[in-house]
């Protein structure tokens, strides 16, 4: 299997999906260096769910799938800790990892194909309705939502993966799926 490139990882106790945002406090030297280097290179870094270990201290074992992120915003809190707002962009599969001397995990990755711009299928229309209600309830708290995308299978699936009260393992399962319709079918299967 071919490797598309190398990507430094920031393992977290959350599964980020494409288009979703997460806030992050960065205080460990290895991750401060990662953010600095990422800003200089413009290449971003990857976020993966932690399967074993913690997000501080010894290097954690990351899941085999993750998303590349871009830094949307940053600030330094009153406590002097760097605060980032990250947004997931494209999915990747980790082929192998190595740990640098400073404890930073770097992965050789294979990029997953972008989702097609398929329209929502009739059997998944309920999911778009559910998402519409969730977005309506969230109001301004979910400003990135664009109701015009409620007819696109990929967008509906990723937004539901982001907003529904799923376990991190369920989100990871969705992240591993290449077909947006399969993702929607799985979400439908999890509905009560």
Give short role names for the model-derived ranges.
Residues 1-192:
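N-terminal low-complexity, acidic/polar interaction/targeting segments
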């Amino acid at each position: 299997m071919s490797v598309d490139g190398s990507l430094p990882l920031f393992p977290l106790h959350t599964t980020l999906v494409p288009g979703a945002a997460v806030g992050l406090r960065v205080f460990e030297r290895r991750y401060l260096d990662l953010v600095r280097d990422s800003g200089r290179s413009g290449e971003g870094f990857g976020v993966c769910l932690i399967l074993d270990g913690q997000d501080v201290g010894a290097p954690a074992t990351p899941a085999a799938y993750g998303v590349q992120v871009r830094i949307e915003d940053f600030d330094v809190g009153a406590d002097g800790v760097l605060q980032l707002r990250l947004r997931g962009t494209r999915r990747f599969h980790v082929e192998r990892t190595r740990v640098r001397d400073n404890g930073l995990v770097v992965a050789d990755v294979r990029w997953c194909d972008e989702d097609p711009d398929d329209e929502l299928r009739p059997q998944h229309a309920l999911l778009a309705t559910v998402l519409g209600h969730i977005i309506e309830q969230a109001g301004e708290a979910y400003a990135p939502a664009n109701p015009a995308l409620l007819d696109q299978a990929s967008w509906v699936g990723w937004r539901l993966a982001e907003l529904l009260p799923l376990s991190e393992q369920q989100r990871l399962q969705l992240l591993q799926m290449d077909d947006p319709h399969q993702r929607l079918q799985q979400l439908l299967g999890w509905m009560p």
